[in-house]
């Protein structure tokens, strides 16, 4: 077969993922545009796939001999990217991302997984010492002195389905919070994805509050949340029930032995409008001798969800940490602020998410058709750079 090439990724995104209309009209807010919006947006997306994280590096690419091979027609500078991202409507990119996820589901990208999960979590990125913008959260030492600023956002991502695919991000600044941003993000993402897209939502202990759990009910998603000491009455009841008791079941997960305790008749706390609460405690004995124990709560009844599936849903939360935040920061440039303006920061974060989704669907599904081996992210990156100046990629075995 022909090897991967940047032009193939562009065609895959436009035609297989249905993004042609989005790249033509990506929510451009410029009144008198001279540079096609397609070129500006696609430059950011393909630049992140090529691990080029600054607007200056994109300016260099658009003035290089490989501009046409990148699928970009016009030359432009970093100032054009800054100007356009300041004025783009983020809702157009959010809608496009949700459309890609729906198309991926129709294309059976998740067909080997019994459940499709959504994970939600927050992080900080883009430390700066520049004049603060409205999203800048001051970094203070123990004496209260400010040492730069950090930008924060909440992400929601597909997890537990064989592919980790981020869907949307919501920024929050001073006077706001991760919790409040998540409450804005969840209903929007659920609305954009449509009913019955996912089977559950998983989150850390910060989201184990009655208002947030009721919000998941409103969007029709069962929830799996970490149980910590922020719910003291339930945590005490779990200890009283499970401590000193033999495990209800023991599983072998890979090289790890997992003991579980599982009960679905705990009383809800005063403000939670559930009839009962189900809690799973797992004790994971890793092959290196380490021990991991945690408790998780859910509104899934035992009749619909076994203990092993409950355990796997809880563990799927780590996907957003490892394959969302860590990959986004270390590989796709989420830590780098291209243009220090709130809307531009948000747009670039959303375009990074789009680049990550396109790259993973192309590499892990499109290139993996038939009996072709899965390429690593680094292998694909190397191949794309090696073939960038060639209109005809070499054959691959």
PLM region spans:
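A short, flexible helix-boundary coil/loop motif
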Residues: 1-7, 19-20, 249-267, 329-331, ...
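Short, positively charged, Gly/Tyr-enriched micro-motifs
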Residues: 31-99, 216
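Active-site-proximal, Lys/Arg-enriched surface segment
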Residues: 82-161
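Basic, short loop/linker segments at the boundary and entry of helix-turn-helix/winged-helix-like folds
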Residues: 2-42
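Electropositive, glycine- and tryptophan-enriched low-complexity nucleic-acid-binding patches
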Residues: 140-196
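An anionic, glycine-rich sequence signature occurring as long contiguous blocks
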Residues: 224-317
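Short, conserved catalytic/metal-binding motifs centered on acidic residues
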Residues: 43-44, 58, 77, 81, ...
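Short amphipathic alpha-helical "interface-anchor" segments enriched in bulky aromatics
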Residues: 9-12, 58, 304-339
């Amino acid at each position: 077969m022909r090897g991967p090439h940047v032009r193939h990724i562009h065609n895959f995104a436009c035609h297989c993922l249905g993004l042609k209309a989005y790249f033509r009209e990506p929510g451009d807010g410029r009144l008198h545009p001279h540079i096609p919006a397609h070129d500006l947006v696609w430059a950011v997306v393909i630049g992140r796939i090529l691990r080029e994280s600054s607007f200056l590096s994109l300016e260099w690419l658009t003035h290089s001999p490989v501009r046409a091979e990148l699928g970009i027609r016009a030359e432009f500078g970093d100032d054009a990217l800054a100007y356009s991202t300041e004025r783009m409507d983020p809702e157009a990119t959010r809608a496009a991302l949700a459309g890609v996820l729906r198309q991926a589901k129709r294309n059976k990208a998740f067909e080997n997984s019994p459940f499709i999960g959504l994970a939600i979590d927050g992080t900080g990125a883009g430390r700066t010492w520049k004049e603060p913008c409205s999203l800048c959260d001051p970094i203070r030492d123990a004496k209260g002195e400010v040492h730069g600023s950090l930008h924060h956002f909440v992400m929601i991502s597909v997890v537990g389905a064989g592919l980790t695919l981020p869907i949307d991000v919501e920024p929050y600044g001073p006077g706001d919070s991760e919790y409040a941003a998540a409450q804005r993000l969840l209903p929007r993402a659920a609305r954009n994805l449509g009913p019955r897209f996912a089977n559950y939502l998983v989150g850390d202990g910060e989201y184990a509050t009655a208002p947030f759990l009721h919000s998941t009910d409103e969007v029709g998603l069962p929830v799996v949340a970490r149980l910590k000491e922020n719910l003291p009455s339930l945590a005490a009841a779990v200890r009283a029930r499970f401590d000193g008791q033999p495990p209800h079941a023991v599983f072998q997960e890979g090289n790890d032995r997992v003991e579980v305790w599982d009960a679905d008749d705990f009383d809800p706390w005063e403000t939670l409008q559930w009839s009962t609460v189900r809690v799973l405690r797992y004790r994971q004995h890793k092959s290196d001798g380490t021990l991991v124990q945690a408790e998780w709560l859910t509104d899934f009844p035992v009749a619909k969800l076994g203990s092993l599936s409950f355990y796997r849903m809880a563990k799927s939360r780590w996907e957003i940490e490892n394959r969302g935040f860590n990959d986004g920061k270390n590989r796709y440039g989420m830590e780098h602020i291209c243009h220090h303006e709130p809307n531009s920061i948000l747009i670039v974060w959303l375009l990074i998410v789009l680049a990550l989704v396109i790259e993973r669907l192309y590499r892990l599904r499109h290139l993996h058709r038939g009996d072709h081996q899965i390429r690593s992210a680094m292998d694909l990156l190397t191949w794309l750079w090696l073939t960038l100046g060639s209109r005809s990629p070499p054959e691959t075995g």
